[in-house]
């Protein structure tokens, strides 16, 4: 019975593994270094996803209608170096400003003779450009970190809109004639309108009215507003000071000298409730600190002064103190309850004695421990929830307070964690540690060992091989050392950047991404924009074609997205030939170059269908370690990455059709699953959702159904 349950659990683990894969771009796109990729550039920021604040003039766009004629050293927040403001005879596009002025400069090959820069980041959405001669212009954007982004566009003698889809968050932009342009002569370069991407336009705020004597309300991330009333007493009352407030907090305190009823200040989201001076504790809410009302009944002698706890980030304790003549019998107090992101109510003393609060740090504050000189008293612990600390118990002697650290604080002694050893394992559970062998269940289904790659298509069997049962994946072994092909990091970075426009799992889901023309076009433009040079762009796009080779017939953009000025390197071994049918728009004209360069010339275009044969080198994704994926030639078919699991039974032999992998990819240890622990699953990062297109949805559905049947069978057999 036990063996049957273990076998069913192992089979479920195998099925779960078959539905997952490695996100190969993750190591290239880990931003754990302050929002930047460790050792690389920040994540690419397209204008569509930027959040720059714009001036009112930038919100409507620059049309230069209010700029004086002549030199244009500065306009709004920008420095226009090398530009002049002049009149233009060209008709503006609809909705692109008014007037007839433009910012004019010159462009030439190889050098930049103009620059537009700003002291803060900006994102240009679109330029309206006209040239003296039709040319291909390179727009070069300087980024805050010193990197550069560029895009290339062909502009004519009429007003040409130039869209910027890749280079957001820039500090400068300059232009020159691109090397692919037929025109190599220096010519006039006119900007008729600049449209900015403004997701957060700047706004003006109304003046704040003068404050009144009423307590200030508590709002987001604020501290408690406390009213303190001091009633006349035979003895001099102890001075009361409000708690200091720091980041995200402020205490509004009103003090009156006449006894009068007070109402608590209104509290809203993320604030703490101000309460009257009673013996009942004030409630705590999320992101707030407890406002504790303490009634101190002093002895005939003068009471000692009481100082409130300090306020730090996200927390502050405001204490209301009322001094009244009373006998020496101590009054019982109860701690205030603690809730999410709150601090613990303080314990009070039975006699007047100085108390010092525990240090408060980020998201936490330690409940203070007090000294009782008269009668030892204890208090019940206040309930603590998410991100709160524990109320301490009052003891007869003074004790040191436990330090508070990020997200937690414990004021009571805690037991040390005892390291878990193998003695804790039930004696009825067997532990198996194979040398380099692999686990294969007795169903003629070969389960690959723990290695670091992802599944791919089933290779065609040879004449001597036997096929496994229908519906099973077949894998071949990896070479002892995969052949690393050196894919430029710009490709996985761009794939990660633009995956957000799709419904795919992540940038490793190539079977979902490759058929998407918009995605492929955006990635290719991103590679062209952020590639260091043409060689890096060509190499990155070559790998993209290799990754998406099987989808070229259904998505010709995989081939046509390559810029005309970029030449892909020739394919040597392992090449595949794909026939692509594309529709292109080409100009049709018999006019001379002099005529086409005249202002106002409108070219004529026609649509043609082009059929061509493309040779690509398929590329597969293989990982030598879970965090180090590499690209290898497509001739290698790799089994999926499976973390070390706990098989329930151990096979006596390996099926003949399975190939034993080399030592380099064998797991270090394999253990049987404990009865109380669920069957482990493939913990890839990030975990892909269930739905990944039609194929993945079917596999995920079958996995869930199989798991349910297995669980039901296990219960019946048990």
Swiss-Prot record:
Family: Belongs to the RBT5 family.
UniProt keyword annotation of Repeat present: yes
Membrane topology of the entry: Lipid-anchor; GPI-anchor
Record bears the keyword Ion transport: no
Source species of the chain: Arthrobotrys oligospora (strain ATCC 24927 / CBS 115.81 / DSM 1491) (Nematode-trapping fungus)
Effect of deleting the gene: Reults in the formation of more traps in the presence of nematodes and an increased sensitivity to certain nitrogen sources as trap inducers. Lacks cell surface adhesive materials and leads to more porous cell wall structures. Affects the expression of many nitrogen metabolism, host-pathogen interaction and mycelia development related genes during sodium nitrate-induced trap formation.
Signal peptide: 1-19
Free-text comment on this protein's domains from its UniProt entry: The CFEM domain is involved in heme-binding. It contains 8 cysteines and is found in proteins from several pathogenic fungi, including both human and plant pathogens.
Function (record text): Cell surface adhesion protein that plays a key role in switching between the saprophytic lifestyle and the predacious lifestyle (nematode trapping). Likely functions to prevent energy-consuming trap formation in the absence of nematodes, and keeps the fungus in the saprophytic life style. May influence the induction signal of trap formation by limiting the porosity of the cell wall and thus affecting its permeability of nitrogen source.
InterPro entries cross-referenced by the UniProt entry: Extracellular_membr_CFEM_dom (IPR008427)
Coiled coil ranges: none
Prodomain positions: 694-718
Positions of the UniProt region annotated as Disordered: 452-472
UniProt Sequence repeat ranges: 217-243, 244-265, 266-282, 283-309, 310-336, 337-358, 359-382, 383-402, 403-420
Keywords: Cell membrane, Cell wall, Disulfide bond, Glycoprotein, GPI-anchor, Heme, Iron, Lipoprotein, Membrane, Metal-binding, Repeat, Secreted, Signal
GO cellular component labels: extracellular region; plasma membrane; side of membrane
Residues that coordinate or bind heme: 509
GPI-anchor amidated glycine-type lipidated residues: 693
CFEM domain: residues covered: 462-575
Domain of life the protein comes from: Eukaryota
PTM (free text): The GPI-anchor is attached to the protein in the endoplasmic reticulum and serves to target the protein to the cell surface. There, the glucosamine-inositol phospholipid moiety is cleaved off and the GPI-modified mannoprotein is covalently attached via its lipidless GPI glycan remnant to the 1,6-beta-glucan of the outer cell wall layer.
Gene: MAD1
Name used for this protein in its record: Adhesin-like cell surface protein MAD1
MF annotations from Gene Ontology: metal ion binding
